[in-house]
């Protein structure tokens, strides 16, 4: 018997794949939404215990049908653009993958006839350049990139849907994560420092 039905967007990525490995051990029923199977080896230990559906998160029709069919108790939204440079090269795509996808999922949850928790994977980049260090959750946000601005907008959507509609929304800001399965990106600070 499964404990929770958990739908994870971006479940084959660095953070998502480690989360999948942990959740599978706890016997949750998991569905991964991914736009590409290129990182399938990230979950080689767990892939027989999860459902994988190839859907681009900006295909809202297919994403909505998958949510309705799976009937999740929890949606963990980790998918989206994570590149600052790509957000400047194609800002419209960044809005689609980071901002509109979050809003679509929240709206879909609002329409469901049962409660569903929403967890947003955000980033410390929403803070921008802080006036003092160290930063904490109360540090004012002043993003300096398109990516950071879209992620902050997604956080605000979560807060609004919680306050106005009573949705159970949570936000966690991922900060300089690194480790096995990480995609090597030339301008990522933590990896370059190490």
List PLM regions with ranges.
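SDR active-site strand-loop-helix element
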Residues: 9, 33, 75-79, 118-124, ...
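Conserved glycine-rich Rossmann-like NAD(P)H-binding loop of the short-chain dehydrogenase/reductase
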Residues: 28-38
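Rossmann-fold cofactor-recognition segment
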Residues: 47-59
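NAD(P)H-binding glycine-rich loop region in Rossmannoid oxidoreductase-like domains
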Residues: 57-97
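Conserved Rossmann-fold NAD(P)-dependent oxidoreductase catalytic core, especially the SDR/UDP-sugar
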Residues: 77, 103-146
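NAD(P)-dependent short-chain dehydrogenase/reductase
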Residues: 132-133, 156-194
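Active-site helix of classical SDR
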Residues: 146, 150-153
């Amino acid at each position: 018997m499964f404990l929770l039905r958990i739908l994870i967007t971006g479940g084959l990525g660095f953070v998502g794949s480690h989360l999948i490995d942990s959740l599978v051990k706890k016997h949750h029923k998991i569905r991964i939404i991914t736009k590409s199977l290129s990182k399938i080896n990230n979950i080689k230990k767990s892939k027989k215990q999860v459902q994988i559906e190839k859907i681009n998160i900006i295909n809202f029709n297919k994403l909505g049908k998958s949510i309705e069919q799976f009937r999740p108790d929890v949606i963990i939204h980790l998918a989206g653009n994570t590149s600052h440079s790509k957000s400047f090269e194609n800002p419209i795509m960044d809005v689609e993958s980071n901002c509109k996808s979050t809003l679509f999922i929240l709206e879909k949850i609002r329409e469901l006839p049962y409660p569903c928790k929403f967890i947003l994977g955000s980033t410390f980049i929403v803070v921008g350049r802080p006036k003092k260090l160290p930063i904490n959750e109360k540090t004012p946000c002043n993003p300096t990139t398109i990516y950071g601005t879209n992620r902050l907008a997604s956080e605000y959507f979560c807060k609004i849907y919680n306050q106005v509609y009573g949705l159970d929304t949570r936000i966690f800001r991922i900060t300089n994560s690194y480790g096995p399965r990480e995609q090597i990106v030339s301008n990522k600070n933590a990896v370059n420092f190490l």
